[in-house]
Swiss-Prot record:
The record's free-text note on cofactor binding: Binds a second Mg(2+) ion via substrate during catalysis.
PROSITE patterns: ENOLASE
InterPro entries named in the record: Enolase, Enolase-like_C_sf, Enolase-like_N, Enolase_C, Enolase_CS, Enolase_N
Pfam family, one: Enolase_C
List of residues binding (2R)-2-phosphoglycerate: 163, 338, 367-368, 389
Biological role: Catalyzes the reversible conversion of 2-phosphoglycerate (2-PG) into phosphoenolpyruvate (PEP). It is essential for the degradation of carbohydrates via glycolysis.
One biological process term in Gene Ontology: glycolytic process
Name this polypeptide is given: Enolase
NCBIfam families cross-referenced by the UniProt entry: eno
Reaction(s) this enzyme catalyzes, per UniProt: (2R)-2-phosphoglycerate = phosphoenolpyruvate + H2O
GO cellular component, one term: extracellular region
Active site annotation, chain numbering: 205, 338
Organism: Geobacter metallireducens (strain ATCC 53774 / DSM 7210 / GS-15)
Length: 429
């Protein structure tokens, strides 16, 4: 009864008002699975292709009607009649149909929408929650959240160079407690910023986006907020950064406009990070070097890889082939997992498996352009990732994922596992 009988895609809007794809997969039993595809602002060069129409008369050229048509008129006829429980077979059928490395014929957004909708339909058909359908009976670990409470870079219209300043409530005993701590710190930060006369408008991912005197001032106001909320920085709450360095890199030099000395060589960037790590309880730095600066990545990993989590996002783009090269060269010790960077559930699971076998941590991540779809939350529990990055404590597109994790924790009840600081198993704490 899990035979696919119909596949239908439509154009919807994401959290930034840009079009994206929503796909519905119908089964013989009458069951339906629905999935929406996210979209990024700062993207890696080697990401799978997000197919846009380019017609400037519609949505400023960002329409996705070509991708919709590819689902409804090309992919659908190839997978109708297949069993929804054959996830690997269906994903492979779509990859073969596309025939390109970066999914540039059908579009990664078209393929991913179908891939996720198939998984959701299959889970519904067999009567399992999505996290358990994907991960099996051992899927029970709730992730420690990386909460992006202050935005800069491509995620905000301000003068802050670093894209994301995040808190990780690692001292919590449960996901629900971690969420509460994060919310309290978020509200405390609003008070701190107001007290300094700063703007409290929010960026794409729900974090505050004020103009500040320096990147370091962002860390100072967050430290103040943690303490005002009644928590101890470095013990109960840790800090994490997403620098998105590819956006700052040109001709072998990094430019941080908000620093006293804006121009930095890769070695000077490592010095800059080491100084911050020595001064603040930073446990994780994502995309500290540009995606093509592999020598810089090696410098950063060698210097700080035993002390903190070094996360590759634009570097690895959730691609097992690129990740394998990074592992062989000893670059980074963690990978950010974004479903739409690679474009299918099967390939995403392959990347996670490869990372874990190499002793790399995995951080399941949203994109800056999100929807109300909560697949991300289920995926983080399905693979026992231990960490999730899904924005601030504001905007429904972000909070939807947190609320789904609360439901999952409730459902798992006494079998739920939350490891807090222990998720950083591959660094010295």
């Amino acid at each position: 009864m899990s035979e696919i009988t119909d596949v239908y895609a439509r154009e919807i809007l994401d959290s930034r008002g840009n079009p994206t794809l929503e796909v519905e997969v119908f089964l013989e039993s009458g069951v339906m699975g629905r999935a929406a595809v996210p979209s990024g602002a700062s993207t890696g060069e080697r990401e799978a292709l997000e197919l846009r129409d380019g017609d400037k008369s519609r949505y400023l050229g960002k329409g996705v009607l070509k991708a919709v048509d590819n689902v409804n008129n090309i992919i659908a006829e190839q997978i109708i009649g297949m069993e929804a429980t054959d996830q690997i077979g269906i994903d492979q059928r779509m990859l073969d149909l596309d025939g390109t490395e970066y999914k540039s014929n059908l579009g990664a957004n078209a393929i991913l929408g179908v891939s996720l909708a198939v998984a959701k339909a299959a889970a519904e058909e067999v009567g399992l929650p999505l996290y358990q359908y994907i991960g099996g009976s051992n899927a029970k670990e709730l992730p420690l959240p990386m909460m992006n409470i202050l935005n800069g870079g491509a995620h905000a219209d301000n003068n802050v160079d670093i894209q994301e300043f995040m808190i990780m409530p690692a001292g919590a005993k449960s996901f629900a407690e971690a969420l509460r701590m994060g919310a309290e710190i978020f509200h405390a930060l609003k008070g701190v910023l107001k007290g300094k006369g700063y703007n409290t408008a929010v960026g794409d991912e729900g974090g505050f986006a004020p103009n500040l005197k320096s990147n370091e001032e962002a860390l100072e106001v967050i430290m103040d907020a943690i303490q005002k909320a009644g928590y101890k920085p470095g013990e109960e709450v840790l800090l994490a950064l997403d620098v998105a360095s590819s956006e700052l890199f040109n001709d072998g030099v990094y430019t941080l406009e908000n620093e006293a000395e804006p121009k930095k060589t890769p070695a000077q960037m490592v010095d800059f990070y080491e100084n911050l790590v020595n001064k603040y309880p930073i446990v994780s730095i994502e995309d500290g070097m540009a995606e093509n600066d592999w020598d810089g990545w090696k410098l950063l990993t060698d210097r700080l890889g035993k002390r903190i989590q070094i996360v590759g996002d634009d570097l690895f783009v959730t691609n097992p082939r690129i990740l394998k090269e990074g592992i062989q060269k000893g670059i980074a010790n963690s990978i950010l997992i974004k479903l739409n960077q690679i474009g299918s559930l099967t390939e995403t699971l392959d990347a996670i498996e490869m990372a874990k076998r190499a002793g790399y941590t995995c951080v399941i991540s949203h994109r800056s352009g999100e929807t109300e779809d909560t697949t991300l939350a289920d995926l983080s529990v399905a693979v026992n990732a231990g960490q999730i990055k899904t924005g601030s404590l504001c905007r429904t597109d972000r909070v939807a994922k947190y609320n789904q994790l609360l439901r999952i924790e409730d459902e798992l009840d006494t079998t739920a596992l939350f490891r807090g600081k222990d998720v950083f198993y591959n660094i010295r704490k």
